[in-house]
């Protein structure tokens, strides 16, 4: 089934070439079934690339999805043309009276700052608080996962000795519909300077660790109802994202490691090995199907 996005969004052409069925708003209104309403707060610098990555995963399911793109009013994007933002994005002020089946909050390159020093932190906390009763299931990715765990449960983040970058082997730690169809072990990308610790999460009765890695630590945490899902890695990343970040970092003279388990023979001149794609697609499909579609009320106004 298709994903419904605003007409003219650049991601449409890219995804159409990949065989992902993207439906325009005009065509979608003639469908009789109720689509899932998904909100995406895009905090990543390259918003267009992140749109493509997330829509690719949301569009590869049997469910029709309407996507609303959100940006922060208290932080003006510097790496995405303002024309793109004004055309395709909306603000929290414009959607706070609506309800959504699902919500994705992306990562952001601010993890070395204390949460309260992030310039849009106050706005983000307002949005996260709103999500409690106006969204059926919210997925927090990378820095957003750390921010959500801190805001809702008081779990701190800790700075790592060096950047964690690469693709790491994970194991399913607890049965969950999110990992239905997964093997016991799977691979997933990480790209971060900070972490949350297992022992802090274990102290919170409402939370469960669903997947983890010996090298990368905690990967997926959820509350008991799976209406809050915290993903510390980047399953949405495409083949070249870690490579592009690595070249960006060394171009800034940063001392970062070569992404682990990524380049053949750890040679950055070679094409990266894609080992997490099946996990990413299945994980997002399970979220849409089991955590949202099969549980969300038919009437959006009944979400609370």
Swiss-Prot record:
EC number: 2.3.1.31
Site (Important for substrate specificity): 191
InterPro entries: Class_I_gatase-like, HST_MetA, MetA_family
Pfam families membership: HTS
Localization: Cytoplasm
Positions that bind substrate: 163, 191, 248
GO molecular-function terms, A-Z: homoserine O-acetyltransferase activity; homoserine O-succinyltransferase activity
Any one annotated GO CC term: cytoplasm
Pathway this chain belongs to: Amino-acid biosynthesis; L-methionine biosynthesis via de novo pathway; O-acetyl-L-homoserine from L-homoserine: step 1/1
Major location (coarse): cytoplasm
Site (Important for acyl-CoA specificity): 111
Identification of the protein by name: Homoserine O-acetyltransferase
Record organism: Thermotoga maritima (strain ATCC 43589 / DSM 3109 / JCM 10099 / NBRC 100826 / MSB8)
């Amino acid at each position: 089934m298709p994903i419904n996005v605003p007409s003219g969004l650049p991601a449409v052409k890219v995804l159409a070439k990949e065989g992902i069925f993207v439906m325009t708003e005009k065509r979608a209104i003639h469908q009789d079934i109720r689509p899932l309403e998904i909100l995406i707060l895009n905090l990543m610098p390259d918003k267009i690339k992140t749109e493509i990555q997330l829509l690719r995963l949301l569009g590869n399911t049997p469910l029709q999805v309407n996507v609303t793109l959100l940006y922060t009013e208290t932080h003006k994007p510097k790496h995405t043309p303002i024309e793109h933002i004004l055309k395709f994005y909306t603000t929290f002020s414009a959607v706070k009276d609506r309800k959504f089946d699902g919500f994705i909050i992306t990562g952001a390159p601010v993890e070395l700052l204390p949460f309260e020093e992030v310039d849009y932190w106050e706005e983000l906390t307002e949005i996260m608080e709103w999500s409690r009763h106006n969204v059926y299931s919210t997925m927090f990715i990378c820095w957003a996962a750390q921010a959500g765990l801190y805001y809702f449960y008081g779990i701190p983040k800790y700075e790592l000795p060096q950047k964690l970058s690469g693709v790491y082997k994970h194991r399913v730690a607890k049965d969950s519909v999110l990992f239905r169809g997964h093997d016991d072990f799977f691979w997933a990308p990480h790209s971060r300077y900070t972490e949350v610790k297992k022992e802090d999460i274990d102290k919170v009765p409402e939370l469960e660790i669903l997947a983890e890695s010996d090298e990368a630590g905690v990967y997926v945490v959820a509350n008991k109802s799976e209406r809050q899902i915290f993903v510390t890695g980047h399953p949405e990343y495409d083949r070249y994202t870690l490579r592009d970040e690595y070249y960006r970092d060394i171009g800034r003279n940063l001392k970062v490691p070569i992404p682990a388990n990524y380049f053949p023979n750890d040679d950055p001149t070679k094409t990266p090995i894609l080992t997490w794609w099946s996990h990413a697609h299945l994980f997002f499909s399970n979220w849409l199907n089991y955590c949202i579609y099969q549980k969300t009320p038919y009437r959006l106004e009944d979400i609370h």
